[in-house]
Amino acid sequence: MDGGDDGNLIIKKRFVSEAELDERRKRRQEEWEKVRKPEDPEECPEEVYDPRSLYERLQEQKDRKQQEYEEQFKFKNMVRGLDEDETNFLDEVSRQQELIEKQRREEELKELKEYRNNLKKVGISQENKKEVEKKLTVKPIETKNKFSQAKLLAGAVKHKSSESGNSVKRLKPDPEPDDKNQEPSSCKSLGNTSLSGPSIHCPSAAVCIGILPGLGAYSGSSDSESSSDSEGTINATGKIVSSIFRTNTFLEAP
């Protein structure tokens, strides 16, 4: 009995009576009156019959919701315009960055200028120092050269050659300061026994006073035909004061 009653209820639900349809139509009309606009028709439109199964209709609703969700979180929909507060904030930040950059450039230029000025000062001081060092180094070299020349001339040897064959004579320093008074006269009378008559000895026109660096008094060759003669005077410090080179010229008396 119970099983038969359940079967009858299921069969009854499959069939809808005219009264139920009228009641549903009346309910839809009431709802339509609530949402109806002036341009809409007065009567509620009939429901469109959908021959699809329940599964297909549910699947369609699910797909529709998924599309709406994806459309909401797309990248192009996430981009939006900036409002006024945000633009003001960004302008302030950019202005502060420009000020900081400007200050940094000014500091760099100032440091470069100071560095160049210091380099110029150091360069000038180094040049002055080099000039002073050059002066200090040149003076000892000159004194050293003078002493070395004096030492070299102190041991110079003079060879005197004549027809009579005189011996070698070494130069010696003269203790007397007045050396010019010892210069011989312009002409001398030589009494040479080897010559037949009296003769007059006259000096040549070339007279050398002082010395040149690196030069000493050297005698001529020991040949008996050489008739040149040189005499020098050396003071107490070993420096030649005057040197007279003569050429023996023998003139017969008239």
From Swiss-Prot:
Annotated region described as Disordered, given as residue ranges: 22-52, 155-195
Superkingdom: Eukaryota
Annotated positions of the N-acetylmethionine modification: M1
Cellular localization per UniProt: Nucleus
Acetylation in keyword set: yes
Modified residues (Phosphoserine): S17, S222, S228
Record's compositionally biased regions (Polar residues): 183-195
Transmembrane annotation, as ranges: none
InterPro entries attached to this UniProt entry: FAM192A (IPR039845), FAM192A/Fyv6_N (IPR019331)
Region (Interaction with PSME3): 201-254
Entry function: Promotes the association of the proteasome activator complex subunit PSME3 with the 20S proteasome and regulates its activity. Inhibits PSME3-mediated degradation of some proteasome substrates, probably by affecting their diffusion rate into the catalytic chamber of the proteasome. Also inhibits the interaction of PSME3 with COIL, inhibits accumulation of PSME3 in Cajal bodies and positively regulates the number of Cajal bodies in the nucleus.
Protein name (database record): PSME3-interacting protein
The species this protein was found in: Homo sapiens (Human)
Lineage: Eukaryota, Metazoa, Chordata, Craniata, Vertebrata
